[in-house]
Amino acid sequence: MKILYDYQAFDMQTHGGVSRYFSELISHLPQNIKTDISVIETNNIYLKALGKEPAGTLYKNFLWHKDSAIKHFIYKLYYNIKNGDFNRLDHTPAINRFESIKQLKEGDFDLLHPTFFDPYFLKFIGNKPFVITVHDMIPELFPQYYACDDIQIIHKNITIPQAAHIITVSQQTKLDLCRVMNIKEEQVSVVYHGANESQYIPNENDKDFEYILYVGERHLYKNFNDFAKSCIPILKRHKELMVICTGKPFTDSERKMLKEYGMENRFKHRFVENDQEMLDLYHYALAFVFPSSYEGFGLPILEAYKAGCPVLLNHASCFPEIAGNAAIYFNMNKHKNNFEEQFETFYHLNGTERKELIKRQEERLKRYSWNKSAKLSAEIYQRFI
């Protein structure tokens, strides 16, 4: 059995949940399954770790090594004509897309697992089956944050109904998918993410202050603004406490908001270079707080569990499904916000109670394995070949 994975997620992300999911899945599949990834060059950190060339290699080695306008012009002309993209002769060639189409036409695979929802492959796949993974239904459930002609929604409505089978990463996502898109339940299987199985050894802590950790994006449904506002009385009460945020730097509007709250010096942004650094941030945090209204799975929960970091979660979406009794829950919605109260309850746990919480997290983490995820995915592939 040979599975073809296309380029989409790896062109979209240098790192991140979707591309990490596919790199872990591919790396953990049973040995009797052959795989191919239709990517020639990439800046995705997970694929580079698997030996793929960095983006720009093809251009660098084209004709002569020195960059120039004439070299760039000939490069675009050559590869676009070579791949029949006559309407885009002045565009930088979509090298990985061309490679995907080439491999689809050659047909040397048994099943395609596209890594996102662009339906470009449908006219090249012939009678070969494809399986697709739905990571969340955020654009459909929060349309107020997306354009009415959002391309992801359009692509999902074309691609998903034509799949031989659909994988979702949580039961919550399956329920949302079936309800919103009128998909039959038997067409969908739930395959959870796995946890990073490498040994984690903390580096020495260089922080001389306690901090709450916020991880990832901060746009609207993530509830960052409400979280920041809820932190005001907490930070005033606990003078030594800070909030560290990863992800993109604070926007102008976020900096303005924090300044209005008098909290601009209590919220710090931190760039994270690698998994070790991220796990260290979790490990030395007082707690990891995830106030989001909706996630497809919530991979940072498992990261925090692995690092031995107490987890506080909004009681929403798939969080109770994934975290079980190994987290402290609060409500942060338009009807109720008791984050401050629940944080103070956590803050005043004694040593024994905190150890019990961490022990529950360690036990919960054992449920999530990339080997198990890959085995279940392989069984799904086999059903449709």
Model regions and ranges:
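Carbohydrate transferase catalytic cores enriched for Leloir-type hexosyltransferases
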Residues: 1-385
